[in-house]
């Protein structure tokens, strides 16, 4: 069952709520962070959360099992 919303930190995909939301890696100030992001993410969503960073294209995503 999902418990995280878009922009929240996560450990794996199924934690993230939303059909197109995955747990992906972005870089914030050179540091890796795992956040719930849209699969088709663009920076608008991340900017909304103050995470102005570059999204890894088709970034790493994490499975819980």
From Swiss-Prot:
Taxonomic lineage of the native organism: Eukaryota, Metazoa, Ecdysozoa, Arthropoda, Chelicerata
Main location class: secreted
Post-translational modification: Contains 4 disulfide bonds.
Disulfide bonds: none
Single GO term (MF): toxin activity
Name of the featured protein: U15-hexatoxin-Mg1a
Compartment list: Secreted
Similarity annotation: Belongs to the neurotoxin 25 family. F7 subfamily.
């Amino acid at each position: 069952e999902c418990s995280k919303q878009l922009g929240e930190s996560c450990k794996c995909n199924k934690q993230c709520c939303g059909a197109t939301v995955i747990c992906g890696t972005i870089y914030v100030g050179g540091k890796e962070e795992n956040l719930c992001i849209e699969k088709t993410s663009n920076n608008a969503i991340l900017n909304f959360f103050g995470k102005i960073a570059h999204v890894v294209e088709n970034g790493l995503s994490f499975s819980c099992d």
